[in-house]
Amino acid sequence: MKKPIGKILWRGLGPLLIAIILVAALMLVPFKFGRSSQATIRQAASSMSANVLKGETIKNEAMAENYVPFIGSSELSRMDAFHPSVLAQKYHRDYRPFLMGMAGSQSLTHFLSINALTHVEGKKAVMVLSPQWFVPGGVRKAQFDYFYSPAQMTTFLLHANPNSEADRFAARRLLQFPSTDSDRTVNEALKNIAAGQKLSDGQYWYLKQVKDPMADHQDALFSRLFLNNNQPQLDKAAKTLPSTYDVDDLDGLATRMGMQETTNNPFELKNDFYTKRVKRNMPKLKGSQATWSYVKSPEYSDLQLVLNTFAKKHMEVLFVIPPINAKWAAFTGLDLGMIQNTVTKMKYQLKTQGFNHVLDLSQDGAQPYFMEDTIHIGWRGWLKMDQTVRPFLKTTKAAPVHYKLNDQFYTKHWQQQSANGLD
C-alpha cells in the first residue's frame, strides 16, 4: 500500500520547516538575552574580532562601564608591552581601551559603528588616523563589504534625516557598495534618504519591526562567539613592565626591547615581520612607492561622516596621526613631503571644525624603535603616544565641545584639493 504523498513530503520537509519556523521565532520574537559577563566584555575589548566590530551588543555593554573607544585599523593589533591596553592594565588606569578596528577598517566602517554606539554621549574617545587610508580610490569595496553590518545599517536608516547633507551624502556613498544591494528594502530606503526623502511607511515598518529585532538577536547570539583571545598576550606583556610608571625608565626599556627584536634587517622592522612579509620581496619593493599619494581621496569625505557623528554625540576625541618608518620610506621611494601634505590636509579638516586634540607623530618616523614595522607604531612610539593619551583620559567625561561642522568637506572639490595654502 502506497503511503500518502502528504506524509512523504512531511517526513522529508517537515523537520526543515520546523527548523525555519523556530529560527524565525528566535530572530523575531521580542525577548532579552542575558548580559555579557565581565570576562567576555574584557576579552572582546582586545579581541579585534570582526563580529565585535560589526556588532552592537558587547560594545554598548562596555561603553556603559569604564571602557573607552580606541578606533583605528591594523596598528591597534601591534600588542607589545607599551600598547595602550597593556599600559592601562598594568598601571591600573581608570579606563580600559575597547579596540574598535582591524586591518581594512576605515572611516566609512567606523561611521556606521560609532553611529550605533550608545552610552558614549558626552564621553571621550581616541582615534588613530592612518595616512594610508587616504588612497585615491578610497576604501576598497571588498574591505567595506567584509565589515558591513545589517544591524548598524538599520540603526542609521531608522534615524537618518533626509534634510541633513551628512545623511544624504552617507546614503549616496553607501549605495556605491555591493553589500547594500543584499536587501531590497534597505537599498530603496537608502535611495530615499539620498534623494532627500523620508522613508516610506512600509520601509520604516520593515526596518523597525522585522530588520531591527532580527539584526539585534543575531548580534546578541553571535557577537559573543569566536572571539579572539588576546588577553593572555596582554597579561604576558604587562609582566615585563616595572611596577612604577616612570617615563625615562620605560623609554629605556622600550629602546632595549626594540633593539632586541629588530636584529635581522637594516630598517628596524620587527624580525618576524621582516622575515615573513618583506625579505623575499625586497627586489620588487625597492622604489615601488615613489608615485604613491594620499592627498586626494574620497576618504576625506568619509572621515567627515565620522566627525559629524562625534559632534552629534558631543564626544571629545583625541586624534593620533602615526608616522611612516623613515628608513623604509627611503628604500621604497615614498615621498615624505607628500605625507606631510596629507597630514596638513587632515589637520585642516579637523582643526577648522573644532577638533583640536591632534597628536601629530608624522615626523617621528626616524626615531629609533618608534615603529614596529613599516607603518605601525611600536615600543617608543606607543610610549610617546601615551604621554598625551594618559592626561587626556584622566577623566573620560568630555569637556563642553563646540564644533563648527562644514558641509564643504563632503564635496568632490575637497576630496581632490591639494594641500597648498592650508597651513
Curated annotation (Swiss-Prot):
Keywords: Cell membrane, Membrane, Signal-anchor, Transmembrane, Transmembrane helix
Metabolic or biological pathway, per its Swiss-Prot or TrEMBL entry: Cell wall biogenesis; lipoteichoic acid biosynthesis
GO biological process, any: lipoteichoic acid biosynthetic process
Role this protein plays: Involved in the D-alanylation of lipoteichoic acid (LTA). Could be responsible for the transfer of DltC-carried D-alanyl groups to cell membrane phosphatidylglycerol (PG), or alternatively of D-alanine residues from D-Ala-undecaprenol phosphate to the poly(glycerophosphate) chains of LTA. D-alanylation of LTA plays an important role in modulating the properties of the cell wall in Gram-positive bacteria, influencing the net charge of the cell wall.
Cytoplasmic side stretches: 1-12
Segments on the Extracellular side according to the record's topology features: 34-423
Gene expressing this chain: dltD
Protein name as it appears in the record: Protein DltD
Major localisation: membrane
Cross-referenced InterPro entries: DltD, LTA_DltD
Subcellular location: Cell membrane
Transmembrane stretches, start-end: 13-33
Family: Belongs to the DltD family.
GO CC field: plasma membrane
Organism: Lacticaseibacillus rhamnosus (Lactobacillus rhamnosus)
Membrane topology: Single-pass type II membrane protein
